[in-house]
Amino acid sequence: MADGWMARIDDALAQRRREQTYRERWALSGGNDRLIRDGDRQYLNFSSNDYLGLARHPEVIAAWQQGAAQAGVGAGGSGHVTGYGLHHQRLEQRLADWLGFPRALLFTSGFAANQALVGALTASGDHILADRLSHASLLEAAMHSPATLRRFAHNDADALQRLLRRDCAGNRLVITEGVFSMDGDRAPLPALAEITRAAGCWLMVDDAHGIGVVGEEGRGCAWAPAGRPDLLVVTFGKAVGVSGAAVLCATPVAEYLLQFARHLIYSTAPPPAQIAAIDAALTVVRRGDALRQRLWDNIVRFRRGAAALGFALAPSDTAIQPLVIGDNLRTLQLAQRLRERGVWLTAIRPPTVPPGSARLRITLTSAHLADDIDTLLEALSDAQLQNA
């Protein structure tokens, strides 16, 4: 029987290799920085989610160090035991006030927050209606829940409305992202919010890639009242530059999650030092108009240059600028050609993206210089010609 386990593992790994979808990791230095090192070779980094460059911001680093000195490096337990402290309480209140919700609850990661929220709220007879391109954490949570999952065409409010007319029984939860992690486009939140309110169902938005970057003071995609969801998930590992996540919701929902969200109840709380760093990073985010403007300038420079070179980019006005290649092997080869030219880009392939849509996921940050963008464009042009 033991051999059956290894046979299953060997078959799965062999299939990934055949399909050119085998994932690898590199032990890199400076993965959150503008420049990255692999061994003795240095590259321009265009794969980081640290959109505002806060992972190395001196105020954020100092806050982490001070938090560790004052409160230690671990929380010591679940938030339901001894792990929830004044740092956590203060950050939750600050988030709720800033984003316009009655309550906020901290989680160890965005994946955990999404899984906990969907798993705790849904029951048999409910319906989940999710954008087809929603993040794996959302779709997996929906598939593992007792609810019936239906997917609607990407960013298609009319398709959602048709599904809502068809699926009338039980509670209904509509799920989408603010900024889509692999495509960089934004959900039409005002239209989705209007439809869900009219239908009497709830809207859940994962704004991992919008918070800090989009909206007034970086409040994200859902900051305007017209697009306000019932449930908002924000994460701190992208533009905020740290890690962790929070769920924003009504007070009864927060109390319910404290009773029934197993990912929250049975996980050690985030370290106080991490919470202090997030708090400091949010201060930088709120006054970070100059950082957001620098990021926007880089986005405009890249898109104009790419258009001049004839590249067909996705309709994204965010830090995520995917260049869809299609074929898995060709995408891997193009990524390798770029590394030979000193540019680090990751080849994203199925199952992360749909079959036939393998891509280079180009991410721009406020730390990039204009010369960096020009180097990227030149390298893309040269590598594309060689890879044709």
From Swiss-Prot:
Transmembrane segments: none
Binding-site residues, pyridoxal 5'-phosphate: G110, F111, S181, H209, T235
Matches recorded under SUPFAM superfamilies: PLP-dependent transferases
Keyword set, alphabetical order: Biotin biosynthesis, Pyridoxal phosphate, Transferase
GO biological process: biotin biosynthetic process
Catalysed reactions, semicolon-separated: 6-carboxyhexanoyl-[ACP] + L-alanine + H(+) = (8S)-8-amino-7-oxononanoate + holo-[ACP] + CO2
Self-association state and partner proteins as the record states: Homodimer.
NCBIfam families documented for this protein: bioF
Family under the similarity heading: Belongs to the class-II pyridoxal-phosphate-dependent aminotransferase family. BioF subfamily.
Protein name: 8-amino-7-oxononanoate synthase
Organism for this UniProt entry: Sodalis glossinidius (strain morsitans)
Gene responsible for this protein: bioF
